Amino acid sequence: MEKAFREPAFPRIVKVYFEAYGCTQNYGEARLMQQALSSRGHAIVPSPAEADTSVLVTCTVIDHTERKMLKRMHVLAGEGKPLVVAGCMAAAQRDLVRRTVPGARLLPPRKWPQIVELLGAGTARGDRAVAMEADHAAWRDAIVPIAQGCAGRCTYCITRVARGRVSSYPVDAIVDRVRGYVEAEIKDVKLTGQDTAAYGMDGGTSLPALLRAVTGIAGDFRIRVGMMDPLTALPILDDLIDAYASPKVYKFLHLPVQSGDDGILEAMKREYAVADFERILAGFRAAFPEITISTDVIVGFPGETDDAFARTIDLVRRVRPDMVNVTRFSARAGTPAATMAGQVVGWRAKERSRRLSRLRFRIAREIHAGYVGRTLDVLTTEPGKAGTTLGRTDSYKQVVLPSEEPIGDWRTARIVEGREADLVGELI
């Protein structure tokens, strides 16, 4: 049983527990909130039992995730301490959150800088990128949100309801933030957003311009560019490929196709064709033959016939992505797709998911087998399991090294095994 929710006055120093789920942007915004609080002398604690208040940064992309979020709300509210529900549910499902935890405070994604004011711990500084003193010691990488929202109107997506249209943070603010991380000797920097290729379309700049500004920072570091949509990547393709040529940019492209059938893409309102997706991949691969390609596919979208799914299978066989994130369609209340005709029964969507997953694992094993015997430079990024260290190559391949190595150093490794998700290397 949950304890009675109390609304105590906060002490002068607030102890705050954070819990985040979902996309990289959610984790990035959770870190920014922590930095905002810690820079004002407040304490970030590792458990809700130690906290004066808890902040839950929510994701609601599919119904399974939503159920998990509701459970976590109950558990955290059961501590009998103030709860802040942030992230997408705080914007897209406010009524549901209020019914679930009536005493919780809601902090939508675009309002994250107001965390300080919300906790009575100081004054918020607005709804744009904020220059703050940061304690970087707790993190081995940097997550830098570059924008809110997206340019699309996908019929299945509840995230757009939560985050709205594109609102880009200023180039100078992003550069200053990245420079701060680099000066703190963080070498693995992730630029994130719902659609990074949409960056700047609301303010007369662009993702390539941002990349050139960020890679102009002095230092030895790597930039991973986050997910981008074919819709917004295609108009800037040549300029984007040129910006990717910097040795400071990981040769990694996350480009969700969602379906290999043009009819399904039209029903999704993705606003591009399969041929556009293939053109983007061809351009990047021509410039960077070893680039790592990641894509996303939704199976079981309303109206997806066996023939439509077969075209998705054919596309994956044809373009051979290094990674395919497979998701079964999840009807989200309030989205057009939730009430479309031709809903695919669960068992059929599950079977399609399994079939596509088998294909993607086979392709990944075949690609990674081709690395065995090669010698690669690896940037160490995080500790692994059982005394190992994880690292990334310039094409963002994950390599498992056999010993504990300092994080942020370069190592040379000979690849001895290629697995579905990573490579195994030995130091030389």
Model-derived features with residue positions:
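Conserved, mostly hydrophobic/aromatic
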Residues: 174, 191, 225, 255, ...
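Short flexible coil/turn linkers enriched for glycine and charged/polar residues
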Residues: 137-140, 150-152, 259, 289-291, ...
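Terminal RNA-binding accessory module
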Residues: 6, 328, 339-428
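Conserved SAM/AdoMet-binding glycine-rich loop
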Residues: 83-84, 92-93, 97, 183-306
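Proteins enriched for Cys/Gly/acidic motifs involved in redox and nucleic-acid/cofactor modification
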Residues: 1-199, 236, 253, 275-286, ...
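Short, solvent-exposed loop/turn segments at secondary-structure boundaries
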Residues: 65-67, 165-170, 200-205, 266-270, ...
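Contiguous mid-protein beta-loop-alpha structural module that forms a pocket-lining wall or clamp
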Residues: 304, 318-321
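Glycine-centered loop/turn positions within well-structured domains
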Residues: 113, 152, 164, 197, ...
